[in-house]
From Swiss-Prot:
One of its GO terms (molecular function) is UDP-N-acetylglucosamine 1-carboxyvinyltransferase activity. The gene is murA. This is UDP-N-acetylglucosamine 1-carboxyvinyltransferase. One of its GO terms (cellular component) is cytoplasm. Phosphoenolpyruvate binds at K22, N23. It comes from Pseudomonas fluorescens (strain Pf0-1).
């Protein structure tokens, strides 16, 4: 198992390109199953979860064509099996996203209950209830979700999400694209990745409106046609590199991104003392060598502060001037990184869903272990500013969400290297 060794103390300085968003790419890849012709998806990030999704298509009999820029062409007409097997699905929660498209397009699906990060309960019941509202008959047995469309196909439905669910919204929206009649999704997720998926569906000929609000309307169509679509930039990767620059007192320009999808994070970075300038597709952060000020953060569904940036801001507060409270309202069990940061000398108290972080001037390098994707990013950020060497184990978590993290940080002047386990 690979590890990262980071020698702290280098101030980050330079420019990097932001990758395509994993959380947009995965539902968009799943949505290609709805099409009755070849579809090309561009700006895919080089990540394990993306490779797994493409491998899953291969297992189903679809032969994706990938070019050197990691654009992929998918022709779902060659599909031979409607089963998403456990050995692939177990490593990736997003595999549940093929359920809606397969039932809508092919009338049935068998998808293993998913794996992925161990954060909270993240139930799949909203996906199941949404499809049942459209007439699907669903059984969960032997670790598999087995779904069948009614005779004549799925029917449009009004569905209310009793908790906001990004993947739930995406799954039901995809299924509704080919259902008969109108579907209205209420209390829908408003995330930019949901909007990106809706834009992709519309590029194939779907009729989706209201994405980005809490009510999405989908008028089902008979077929979806070929399209080329470029995945949006990754707002969490963008935010992670900006926090890394802030923590080290540095200056970083991130390119091929979108400042409008990151406003809550940029606001908190300004509050921490960062000077931020934005263009249409770039953001520059400059700390002018200053130590950040501690900030209070409360996670909530978009457009509020994203839960996927919570761990990074705990790392920022750990070396900031003052004390900041970080309140997690989305997932339980999402402070696992705190105990690893304690090993580096951080002063953090966890009380229920709140972490109280009192900044200290210097953290100390230590052997630490990544516990999930975003927690691992917080360990990398803390290691960049710690005295001495930090060894981060289990970095396969990082590789699930950050493309070429050590190369990008090296371009900014970080002393970081990957060593085989």
């Amino acid at each position: 198992m690979d590890k990262l060794i980071i020698t702290g103390g280098a101030r980050l300085d330079g420019e990097i390109r932001i990758s395509g968003a994993k959380n947009s790419a995965l539902p968009i890849l799943a949505a290609t199953l709805l099409c009755d012709g070849p579809v090309t998806v561009g700006n895919l990030p080089h990540l394990h979860d993306i490779t797994t999704m493409i491998e899953l298509f291969g297992r189903m009999g679809i032969e994706p064509v990938i070019d050197e820029k990691l654009s992929v062409e998918i022709d779902p007409r060659t599909i031979k099996t409607l089963i998403a097997p456990y050995e692939l699905v177990k490593t990736m929660r997003a595999s549940i996203l093929v359920l809606g498209p397969m039932v809508a397009r092919f009338g049935e699906a068998e998808v293993a209950l998913p794996g992925g990060c161990a954060i909270g309960s993240r139930p799949v019941d909203l996906h199941i209830r949404g499809l049942e509202a459209m007439g699907a008959v669903i059984d969960v047995e032997g670790g598999y979700i087995k779904a069948k469309a009614p005779e004549g196909g799925l029917r449009g439905a009004h569905f209310f999400f009793d908790t906001v669910s990004v993947t739930g919204t995406e799954n039901i929206m995809m299924a509704a694209a080919l259902a008969k009649g109108r579907s209205v999704l209420q209390n829908a997720a408003r995330e930019p990745e949901v909007v990106d998926l809706a834009n992709f569906l519309n590029a194939m000929g779907a009729k989706v409106s209201g994405a980005g609000t809490d009510t999405i309307t989908i008028d089902g169509v008979e077929r979806l046609g070929s399209a080329f679509y470029k995945v949006m930039p990754d707002r969490i990767e963008t935010g992670t590199y900006l926090v890394a620059a802030a923590v080290t007192g540095g200056r970083v320009k991130v390119k091929d991104t979108d400042p409008t999808i990151l406003e809550a994070v940029l606001e908190k970075l300004r509050e921490a003392g960062a000077e931020i300038t934005c263009g249409e597709d770039w953001i520059e952060l400059n700390m002018h060598g200053k130590r950040p000020k501690a900030v209070n953060v409360r996670t909530a569904p978009y457009p509020a502060f994203p839960t996927d940036m919570q761990a990074q801001f705990i790392s920022l507060n750990a070396i900031a001037e003052g004390t900041g409270a970080v309140i997690e309202t989305i997932f339980e069990n999402r402070f696992m990184h705190v105990y690893e940061l304690h090993r580096m000398g951080a002063h953090i108290q966890v009380e229920g869903n709140t972490a109280i972080v009192t900044g200290i001037e210097t953290l100390k390098g230590a052997p630490v272990m990544a516990t999930d994707l975003r927690a691992s990013a917080s360990l990398v950020i803390s290691a960049l500013v710690a005295q001495g060497d930090t060894l981060i184990d289990r970095i396969y978590h990082i590789d699930r969400g950050y493309e070429c993290i050590e190369e990008k940080l090296q371009m900014l002047g970080a002393k970081i290297r990957r060593v085989p386990g």
